[in-house]
């Protein structure tokens, strides 16, 4: 039976940053994700292997990719970066080239180095899917966020999205701010001003008290203590009071506005614990959507038509 998927036509379908995708390609991926959600089937005609290389801790992204791969009938090879030959001095390139030589058909990589993929993209002949690079980019998270917003509102044009929190260290913020702007949304930023480097002057700044009355979508970000080298000047309580989504602030949001968060969530820091699963929260919906989005991305990577 024919499956109603749209087809791409490149020969090597890397997914490194959202800026590498045209708006048409984004539309194709969201379309294919919806087809998978609706029960459509796709699997490769031959046995294909996908290697997951994670050099940073991950729960949602790693498991979501593995579930997506298995649902597509792919053979999954999980490589623990902390136990790989990289710990013996092997370069990331040599590790990737080794897996390509062994017969792996695509690589899913998360790495702590910003833009790690620059040394790989023109030298590795199999598709590379970026599962997060340092403070740089997280394209599959951005795609699942876009799909979640599209499901909710059916549009991006003039939609007001406030991205709030640790923007300086967030690969999610960068991917989403750039792409939502390309799609016609109105993006605002919020949070501690010292964490707005690279954003302030590009996107308008609002306080959280202003954001809750303005936004259609509030996208909260975790305070990434591991990237601050112990320099965070806020206590959890003071951050929550000044910059977090408190119960009182949530009550002032527009009736149809939603709350998003890429997780992991620091309860009672960026968001009150009782709001994590409140009616306007889409946090666990985002996680659910990650599987179909990653199925669509894997299909794109492994399709030669």
From Swiss-Prot:
GO MF annotation terms: amino acid binding; aspartate carbamoyltransferase activity
Enzyme class: transferase
Enzyme Commission number: 2.1.3.2
Key words of the record: Pyrimidine biosynthesis, Transferase
Residues annotated for carbamoyl phosphate binding in this entry: 60-61, 110, 138, 141, 263-264
Pathway named in the protein's UniProt entry: Pyrimidine metabolism; UMP biosynthesis via de novo pathway; (S)-dihydroorotate from bicarbonate: step 2/3
GO cellular component terms, semicolon-separated: cytosol
Signal peptide: none
Superkingdom of source: Bacteria
Reactions it catalyzes: carbamoyl phosphate + L-aspartate = N-carbamoyl-L-aspartate + phosphate + H(+)
Function of the molecule: Catalyzes the condensation of carbamoyl phosphate and aspartate to form carbamoyl aspartate and inorganic phosphate, the committed step in the de novo pyrimidine nucleotide biosynthesis pathway.
Entry similarity comment: Belongs to the aspartate/ornithine carbamoyltransferase superfamily. ATCase family.
Protein name: Aspartate carbamoyltransferase catalytic subunit
Gene for this chain: pyrB
């Amino acid at each position: 039976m024919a499956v109603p998927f749209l087809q791409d036509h490149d020969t090597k379908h890397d997914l490194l940053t959202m800026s590498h995708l045209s708006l048409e390609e984004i539309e194709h991926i969201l379309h294919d994700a919806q087809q998978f959600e609706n029960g459509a089937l796709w699997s490769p005609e031959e046995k294909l292997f996908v290697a997951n290389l994670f050099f940073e801790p991950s729960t949602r992204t790693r498991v979501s990719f593995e579930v997506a791969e298995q649902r597509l009938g792919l053979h999954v090879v999980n490589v623990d970066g902390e136990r790989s030959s990289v710990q013996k001095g092997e370069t990331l390139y040599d590790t990737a080239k080794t897996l390509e030589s062994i017969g792996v058909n695509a690589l899913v990589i998360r790495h702590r180095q910003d833009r790690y993929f620059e040394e790989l993209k023109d030298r590795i002949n199999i598709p590379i899917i970026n599962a997060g690079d340092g403070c740089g980019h997280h394209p599959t998270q951005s795609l699942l966020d876009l799909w979640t917003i599209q499901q909710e509102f059916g549009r991006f044009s003039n939609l007001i999205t406030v991205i709030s929190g640790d923007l300086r260290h967030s690969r999610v913020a960068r991917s989403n701010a750039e792409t939502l702007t390309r799609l016609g949304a109105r993006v605002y930023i919020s949070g501690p001003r010292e964490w707005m480097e690279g954003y302030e002057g590009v996107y308008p700044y609002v306080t959280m008290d202003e954001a809750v009355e303005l936004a259609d979508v509030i996208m909260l970000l975790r305070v990434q203590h591991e990237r601050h080298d112990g320099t965070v000047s806020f206590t959890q309580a003071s951050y929550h009071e000044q910059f977090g989504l408190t119960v009182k602030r949530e009550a002032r949001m527009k009736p149809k506005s939603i709350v998003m968060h890429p997780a992991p969530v620091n309860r009672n820091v960026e968001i009150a614990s009782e709001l994590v699963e409140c009616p306007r929260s889409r946090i666990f919906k985002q996680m659910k959507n990650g599987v179909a989005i990653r199925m669509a991305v894997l299909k794109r990577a492994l399709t030669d038509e």
